[in-house]
Amino acid sequence: MVGVFLCLEDDMTNEKENQKKTAAGYRTATKLVRGGTLRSAFNETSEAIFMNSGFVYDSAEQAAGRFKGDNEGFIYSRYANPTISMFEERMILLEGAEAARGTASGMAAVNAALLSQVKAGDHVVAPKALFGSCLYIIENILPRFGVDITLINGTDLDQWRNAVTDKTACVFFETPSNPALEIVDIAAVSEIAHKVGAKVIVDNVFATPILQKPLQLGA
C-alpha cells in the first residue's frame, strides 16, 4: 500500500460519519460510484488501492489502543484496510445492511457466512438447486464440523416448514439460483426460519442489490 490517511484519528472518524449521513440520501447510481469513498489527503479521483500490510501510529499508546480495539483505525491489512473498508461501506449502502465484511472470493464469503453461524450439533437447511461450490461446502465441509444438513426443493414452502427444527441454526439459499434460476420466496422462507430462531443467509449474486434486497425482505 502507498501510505496512511494523513489526518487525525478523530478527524477520520468524524469524516466517515459525515460521509455516511450524506451517502444515505444518494440515489442508487450515485451509491454505486461514490458510496463509502473516503479520499486521502492526496485527493485522488477514485478509490486508492492500498497495498501495504501495516500502518504507522503517532505513539505507542495509540498503537496499543488500536490493537486492543479501544479506538478506531487500521492495524493490519489482513483485518481491514482503507480500500476494503470503502468497498464494505458501499455494500452496506446498497444492501441496506448494518455491517459488511469483504472477502477474497465469493466462496470465501459463503464459507465465512455459514461457519460463523453454526457449531457442532447444529442443523442447516438448503435447497438442492445451488451453485456447485456452494453445494460442496454444505454437503462436504459443514458435516466435517458436526453440522447436520437437510437438502430440499427450495421452491416448495411446505418442504421448508417440514425441514426446519429447533436445532436449525440457519437456512441458506440462492435466488435466483445458479445456474437453474429457481426462485425462492425470501420473505416466506425468512418467516419460517425466524419462527425457530434460525438465521437466514441469501446468496444475492445473480440479482444484486440493484434488483433485490434480501435484508428488506426479512433475511
What label would you give each PLM region?
Residues 59-108, 133-140:
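Conserved N-terminal alpha-helix of the aminotransferase class I/II PLP-enzyme fold
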Residues 24-25, 43, 68, 94, ...:
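A generic structural signal for short, solvent-exposed coil/turn residues
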Residues 13-81, 89:
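N-terminal "arm"/small-domain region of PLP-dependent enzymes with the aminotransferase-like
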Residues 19-23, 32-38, 100-219:
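Conserved PLP-enzyme active-site core in the AAT-like
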